[in-house]
Amino acid sequence: MVPWLAYTKSKTGDTLCWSTNGGELLYWATSTHEGENGHWFSEEDAQNKPELVANGHRDFYRANYYLPVKEREAALKKQAFENIRANPKDVLKNWLSNWGRLIFGFPRSYQHEELIMLVLVGVNAPILLLILVACGIGLKHWRTFPLEIVLLFGVTFIYLGGTSLLPGLPRYTVVIWPWLGLGVAAVLSCHLRLELK
């Protein structure tokens, strides 16, 4: 941790700088050009993918991406906030699309969907249904749960909320499936009874 913070301080001059690509992620998350839905693209894609070139990303990248780190971050964040002010409804659609990418891996801008998406839907949809059922039960009976479970759900939803603001991938949610599983098991074991006759 300390070597990383020392490295980022040497690049940015900021003491607690954890990342130098937040501006880039925010730029793509708020891009509302026709056919785009907040999906992240690499520097190479921005300059070579015909649809992105047509939307002006190549020109923007050439003018701003190769600036020193702090200036690049400032330029990307400035454009992202301009995108939000200019088109808040489409940025909201991008955010909703990002939830789909976090859980199921789609939709993605200008890319063909792959068969692996069916696997993600087949696996994650039942898990998501269990989570929603557990949340409904949990909200109704939240005072009956141990504080640890309430805190676990709180931390999990803070993580999900923050992650949903930037372009997402299913791998970003893999780390919290065990936390959610524990919370769901706690809720369902206390308040759901199945009887076989």
PLM regions: where:
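Internal alpha-helical transmembrane segments
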Residues: M1-T15
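Transmembrane-helix signature of polytopic, lipid-linked glycan biosynthesis machinery
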Residues: V2-A6, G138, V155-P170
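Hydrophobic/aromatic-rich transmembrane helices and adjacent perimembrane loops
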Residues: G122, L169-S189
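Membrane-proximal stem/loop segments at transmembrane-domain junctions that anchor or position
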Residues: T15-S97
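Membrane-interface anchor segments at the N-terminal boundary of transmembrane helices
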Residues: A75-L76, E82-L152
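Membrane-interface junctions at the ends of membrane-embedded or membrane-associated helices
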Residues: G136-P146, V184-K197
